[in-house]
């Protein structure tokens, strides 16, 4: 199978006779590339070899992976990994392997840019997980289909990057004209993970897209937040709530009106200075009935760049296990080429370099809006 220009080839082998009992726990080797699972291989009696050579059981086309890099064996009920003298090494917990090593369940080794994770699953668990993954994929594809295309021309341009987590969170965003002089942009982050959170974000997105809030002026951020809060109380929606950043830009005055509901600030970069933090006080949508929301506004100079992002973009864990936050994230933004296409993906790559290997814990969403 191919992902991002590289290939992981799995040659299926016979699983041990222990697998004949359908509900026995089995060991699987999960291949993870750029945070995504690309293969899952049962570990049985046969020793598995990993490397670049096409003759290996698991073939990984990565220049940092040797032709014969690693072997994986089941010994006395334990999964044991052994580096076979590879050029660039195999690592567990940041340490290079120098001898055969037990790989416990839910732990991984790294070779090149790939992770090999040990999972223990029963047959029934695998069936349930496969069904859940099918549901998640459908929900993921539906959310993705609702996201707007980037705007590459005009006085206001957009660029974004969205990478759902393995569990699928509730991120969604949109932007576009309200009338001939006003543009809107907003980002929603629903609590929780899974299909329910994703579908809740879709419901919110559809209400916003259809302007289905009676007597609400969508040019007034405070009114919009109050209308959403009245329609999406958490006790009526399975305990789900969401945070929101909502902004309206007026072309003729260059003023940006905005309001937030439990969401961190949008960051406005202008003239090479430190970013302006655009945030107002107010709880998340659905938490407090009858909540009053107040907006604020700022002037947007020519050449400004606005970043909107979910908390999954900055709440990541470093390879050393340290929790990172906005302090580490903000320096990744801006820069001389920040307004060019691909800016949002550049931020994602920079965050991945700061984070520990493996999938990010939450959805990653970054929206960059450039103003001429």
What are these regions (language model features)?
Residues 17, 225, 296-308, 313-372:
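C-terminal catalytic subdomain
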């Amino acid at each position: 199978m191919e992902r991002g220009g590289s290939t992981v080839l799995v040659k299926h082998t016979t699983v041990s006779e222990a697998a004949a009992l359908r509900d026995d726990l089995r060991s699987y080797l999960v291949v993870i590339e750029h945070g995504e699972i690309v293969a899952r291989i049962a570990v049985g009696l046969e020793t598995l070899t990993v490397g670049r050579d096409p003759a290996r059981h698991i073939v990984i086309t990565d220049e940092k992976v040797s032709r014969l890099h690693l072997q994986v064996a089941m010994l006395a009920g334990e999964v044991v990994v052994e580096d076979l003298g590879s050029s660039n090494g195999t690592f567990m917990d940041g340490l290079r392997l120098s001898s055969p090593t037990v790989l416990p369940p839910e732990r991984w080794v790294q070779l090149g840019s790939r992770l090999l994770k040990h999972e223990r699953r029963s047959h029934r668990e695998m069936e349930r997980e496969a069904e859940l993954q099918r549901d998640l994929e459908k929900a993921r594809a539906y959310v993705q289909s609702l996201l707007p295309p980037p705007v590459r021309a005009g006085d206001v341009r957009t660029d974004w990057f969205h990478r759902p987590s393995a569990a699928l969170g509730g991120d969604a965003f949109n932007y576009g004209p309200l009338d001939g002089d006003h543009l809107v942009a907003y980002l929603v982050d629903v609590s929780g993970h899974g299909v329910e959170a994703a579908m809740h974000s879709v419901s919110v997105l559809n209400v916003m897209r259809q302007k289905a809030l009676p007597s609400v002026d969508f040019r007034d951020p405070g009114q919009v937040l109050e209308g959403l809060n009245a329609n999406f109380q958490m006790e009526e929606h399975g305990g789900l709530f969401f945070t929101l950043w909502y902004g309206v830009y007026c072309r003729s005055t260059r003023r940006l009106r905005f309001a937030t509901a439990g969401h961190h600030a949008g960051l406005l970069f202008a003239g090479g200075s430190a970013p302006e933090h655009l945030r107002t006080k107010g709880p998340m949508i659905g938490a407090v009935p009858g909540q009053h929301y107040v907006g604020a506004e700022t002037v947007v100079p020519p050449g400004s760049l606005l970043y909107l992002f979910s908390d999954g973009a900055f709440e990541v864990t470093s390879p050393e296990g340290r929790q990172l936050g906005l302090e580490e994230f903000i320096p990744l933004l801006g820069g001389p080429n920040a307004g060019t296409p691909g800016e949002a993906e550049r931020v994602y790559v920079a965050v991945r370099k700061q984070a520990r290997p493996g999938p990010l814990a939450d959805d990653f969403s970054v929206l960059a809006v450039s103003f001429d």
